[in-house]
Amino acid sequence: MGMIDKLFCPKCGHQPASQTVFQCTDCRGILEVHVNFGQLTAADFQRMRQSRDQSIWRWFDFFPLAQRSSIVSLGEGNTPLLPATRLGEKLGIANLYVKNDTVLPTGSLKDRSNSVGLSVAREWGFKTAAVMSTGNAAASVAAYSAAAGINSVVMVPAGTAASKIIQARAYGATVVVIDGSFDYEVAKLYKAAVQEFGWYDCLSSNPYRDEGKKSYAYEMADQFDGESPDWVIHPTAGGTGIYAMWKGYKEFLSLGWIQRTPKLVAAQSEAAAPIVAAFERGVPDIEAVIARETVAESIQVGNPASLGWRALAALRESGGTAIAVSDSEILEAQALTGSLAGVFVEPAAATSVAAAKKLRDTGVIGRGDIIVCNLTGHGLKQPEAIRLTDKEFTPIAPTLDMLRQQIARFEIM
């Protein structure tokens, strides 16, 4: 089983006495969980691959949970790794794959994190879970809290897509819309509320929660039959996905279950790209920026707080990079992903495809490289991003002549 070996601060090395503390009492850094997965063998890899449980929990040994009875699962994980041949041809990439997390229970990658996070909350006996979110985490925490029998409170900034708020409400969450910026006013109130009311904190500062995102690496190792792609491109806000994925790859590498690791790429919106800025400057820490408005609202985070440095370290250790893309590039990538790969993604998810195009155009990645773009959220999370005109839906007379005129515009005859 996956037993917690230690909880420690990766910055100063301090190990707190309690496993329920999330922040280092010495340097205020975010703590990290080390799971003792024992002396696993290649036979164990095959056993896990062949498990009837195809959720992330077939990798139970790698997660910080003592008892299987504590698991809170909605069937998350083992999402399709699809060859995107037509999309690849358009981008000039011969071996392009998309990892389709739009099919996860609440439609986003956050389900990987919150299945683990809420399982820990159940094991510890918490009654209420809380999160502040630009939308996707709100819905996911609400769903997994409902499955766990735990109350949920979610705080979102004003302007969050109504579809995401409605989804969280549908799962029974108490949704509070805050007038203010996500990185500052919302964050300040959230931190005070968690301390005041003793709620279980489901933010990325929770070192248990994002252990779930290690499953990206586990699944790709399985789906590539023990091999690794050359590059994995991931839409990035605070960087926990990059960090956790790299941690998962290193765990499998240490066991000999894979022979090499991929280069990781953090894809950010130009309107909120503190990780890209720090990577390009060659500095070890993140400097917060004021996030501007962007169509990629799920990754509109200008202040990764004390977490971003781990993503930077992972990018550099993997030999990868970080890249920012514009809203126009994101919307173009969203349209291409739908029309050429058959996957409807929200704008934030499309940043991985936009980044792949930009990296190919600049020669950073080669035509023959094996590329995976993580598609992290469903397009129905933010349907208003599809900019249609009323003219496209103007009714026509029910005649073949009118139909010919209508469809001729779309070049399908």
What are these regions (language model features)?
Residues 1-413:
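PLP-dependent amino-acid enzyme catalytic core
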